[in-house]
């Protein structure tokens, strides 16, 4: 308030008086400059003096106007703030009056109403009659309720002519063996994990043969009679699992023990005895070696026949070739070989064709039959069951299916890694690792893993390796097409990855 009073009484009036004095001084200075310019002899000097007076006068007037304007603006700001404070006070008084009026109105309204008495009670009220607690009854856990659930192969047993599923428990393994049989790669896969342990299984009764058990006459080379199965089930069998690419081996070994399921072979072509050619597609490693299929007479024995005469010539190598028929016929090759693989159809004992090597014309290979049941290679059974082979009659083979699939022009997928089943000690790979204590001098310093060959392989190209079964190979690179690069006996080259197994699978 004092500042406002000082501006109104002193600053602004003094500024106005200064402006009036400047106006009068400017008039006198103008008269002097005009007379001086007329009377002076040196016109230039008189002009310069006039300019100096003019500049000084303008500066003085401008300063005085600026000071007076600032004082007026400051006065206006002070008055505006006072007005805002007064407005706020008036609003506060108005709100106070409104509140007082509302209180009075409520009081008057309350006089016209009646009082309401409310009883205060607890929100939660305990029940009058307490319920008796129910006694806990423990129910035992039934570990067999989920035995028939899932995609695994169910065991079948023949009882009074009816097929009834037999339940099995969880499998485990106590002492894992350090060797495994060199069964060829299969396309059938199980559903158990890769590291599932196993244990010794109890023998089960032989199953009955379903209607879709065999789908091709060529399969009869791998079929065995239930009599053999019955004799096999008289002793416990130990199965060992492995990790990595042979994980499905464990599942099949645990869910179909003792069931002689044959490996499917390609359906016979309908072109008769004419020569045909199988163009091998490139881009995948070759499957294990292929051997001619055996006729049915060498596999299925008649009742009462001598075991030695029917099974004396069967070896693990022949059963391996029979089980790899589907893999070799449906799998591809990494590159086109210089000499095309050639096959011809020959008459079979049961009317189906056999394949042998001849010079032939071009035709697509037949596709494999649909897999109605999981396939398990039968390897190493013959040495154990020759004495009991004639105990049971041989069931007749079922008729082939009516719906044979058409040929597929798309190239078949490459064969999967080997899927073996450790059923017999006679079918394991006997290998001796001379480098178990330390790597040899020719071994590479940096390698991915050390593997053992489970099949013999002869190179087709100069950049490939040749090795025998049981050879130790150091893998230095794994290609996406299934071929590995490794070192064996100071020789570096390529080899198919499904011909070897990691040594860790044997030592686990």
Swiss-Prot record:
Which ranges are annotated Low complexity under compositional bias?
248-258
Indicate, by first and last residue, each region the UniProt record lists as having compositional bias (Pro residues): 278-290, 393-403, 410-419
- Give start-end positions of Polar residues composition bias: 161-175, 222-235, 307-322, 337-347
Write out the function statement from the record: May act in negative regulation of cell growth and transformation by interacting with nonreceptor tyrosine kinases ABL1 and/or ABL2. May play a role in regulation of EGF-induced Erk pathway activation. Involved in cytoskeletal reorganization and EGFR signaling. Together with EPS8 participates in transduction of signals from Ras to Rac. In vitro, a trimeric complex of ABI1, EPS8 and SOS1 exhibits Rac specific guanine nucleotide exchange factor (GEF) activity and ABI1 seems to act as an adapter in the complex. Regulates ABL1/c-Abl-mediated phosphorylation of ENAH.
Q: What lineage is on file?
A: Eukaryota, Metazoa, Chordata, Craniata, Vertebrata
| Chain intervals for the UniProt region annotation (Disordered) | 159-290, 306-375, 388-421
Q: Name one GO cellular component term.
A: filopodium tip
Q: Which residues does this entry mark as bearing N-acetylalanine?
A: 2
Illness the protein is tied to:
A chromosomal aberration involving ABI1 is a cause of acute leukemias. Translocation t(10;11)(p11.2;q23) with KMT2A/MLL1. ABI1 isoform 2 was found to be present in acute leukemia KMT2A/MLL1-ABI1 fusion transcript.
Output the Gene Ontology terms for molecular function: cadherin binding; cytoskeletal protein binding; protein tyrosine kinase activator activity; SH3 domain binding; signaling adaptor activity
The record's account of tissue expression is:
Widely expressed, with highest expression in brain.
Where does this protein reside within or beyond the cell? Cytoplasm; Nucleus; Cell projection, Lamellipodium; Cell projection, Filopodium
* Keyword Transferase attached: no
Cited PROSITE patterns = SH3, T_SNARE
Name this protein carries in UniProt: Abl interactor 1
Recorded hits in CDD domains, A to Z, give: SH3_Abi1
Quaternary context: Interacts with ABL1, ENAH, STX1A, SNAP25, VAMP2, EPS8, and through its N-terminus with WASF1. Part of a complex consisting of ABI1, STX1A and SNAP25. Part of a complex consisting of ABI1, EPS8 and SOS1. Interacts with SOS1, SOS2, GRB2, SPTA1 and the first SH3 domain of NCK1. Isoform 6 does not interact with NCK1. Component of the WAVE2 complex composed of ABI1, CYFIP1/SRA1, NCKAP1/NAP1 (NCKAP1l/HEM1 in hematopoietic cells) and WASF2/WAVE2. Interacts (via SH3 domain) with SHANK2 and SHANK3, but not SHANK1; the interaction is direct.
The UniProt keyword set, sorted, is:
Acetylation, Cell projection, Chromosomal rearrangement, Coiled coil, Cytoplasm, Cytoskeleton, Host-virus interaction, Nucleus, Phosphoprotein, SH3 domain, Synapse
- Give the record's PTM text: Phosphorylated on tyrosine residues after serum stimulation or induction by v-Abl. Seems to be phosphorylated at Tyr-53 by ABL1, required for nuclear but not for synaptic localization.
């Amino acid at each position: 308030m004092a500042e406002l009073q000082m501006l109104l009484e002193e600053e602004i009036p003094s500024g106005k008086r200064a402006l009036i004095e400047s106006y009068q001084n400017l008039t006198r200075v103008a008269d002097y400059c005009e007379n001086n310019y007329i009377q002076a002899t040196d016109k230039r000097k008189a002009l310069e003096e006039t300019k100096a007076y003019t500049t000084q006068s303008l500066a003085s007037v401008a300063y005085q106007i600026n000071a007076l304007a600032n004082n007026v603006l400051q006065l206006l700001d002070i008055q505006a703030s006072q007005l805002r404070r007064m407005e706020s006070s008036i609003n506060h008084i108005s709100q106070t009056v409104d509140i007082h009026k509302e209180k009075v109105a409520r009081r008057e309204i309350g006089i016209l109403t009646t009082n309401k008495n409310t009883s205060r009670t607890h929100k939660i009220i305990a029940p009058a009659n307490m319920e008796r607690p129910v006694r806990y009854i423990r129910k035992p856990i039934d570990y067999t309720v989920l035995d028939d659930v899932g995609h695994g192969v169910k065991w079948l047993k023949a009882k009074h002519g009816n097929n009834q599923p037999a339940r099995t428990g969880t499998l485990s393994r106590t002492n894992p063996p350090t060797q495994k049989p060199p069964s060829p790669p299969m396309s059938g896969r199980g559903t158990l994990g890769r590291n599932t342990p196993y244990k010794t299984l109890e023998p089960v009764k032989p199953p009955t043969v379903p209607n879709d058990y065999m789908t091709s006459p060529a399969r009869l080379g791998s079929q065995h009679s239930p009599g053999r199965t019955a004799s096999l089930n008289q002793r416990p069998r130990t199965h060992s699992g492995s990790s990595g690419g042979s994980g499905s081996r464990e599942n099949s070994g645990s869910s179909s023990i003792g069931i002689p399921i044959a490996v499917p072979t390609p359906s016979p072509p309908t072109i008769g005895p004419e020569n045909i050619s199988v163009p091998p597609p490139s881009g995948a490693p070759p499957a294990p070696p292929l051997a001619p299929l055996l006729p049915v007479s060498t596999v299925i024995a008649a009742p009462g026949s001598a075991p030695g005469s029917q099974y004396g010539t069967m070896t693990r190598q022949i059963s391996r070739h029979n089980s790899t028929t589907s893999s070799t016929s449906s799998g591809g090759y990494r590159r086109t070989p210089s000499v095309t693989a050639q096959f011809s159809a020959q008459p079979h004992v049961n009317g189906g064709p056999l394949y042998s090597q001849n010079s032939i014309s071009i035709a697509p290979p037949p596709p494999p039959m649909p897999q109605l049941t999981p396939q398990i290679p039968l390897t190493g059974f013959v040495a154990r069951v020759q004495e009991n082979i004639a105990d049971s009659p041989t069931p007749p083979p079922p008729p082939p299916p009516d719906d044979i699939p058409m040929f597929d022009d798309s190239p078949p997928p490459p064969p999967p890694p080997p899927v073996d089943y450790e059923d017999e000690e006679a079918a394991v790979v006997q290998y001796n690792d001379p480098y178990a204590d330390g790597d040899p001098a020719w071994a590479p310093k940096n390698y991915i893993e050390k593997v053992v060959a489970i099949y013999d392989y002869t190179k087709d190209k100069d950049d490939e390796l040749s090795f025998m079964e049981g050879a130790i190979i150091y893998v230095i690179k794994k290609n996406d097409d299934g071929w590995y690069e490794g070192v064996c006996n100071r020789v570096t080259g390529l080899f198919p990855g499904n011909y070897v197994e990691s040594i860790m699978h044997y030592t686990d």
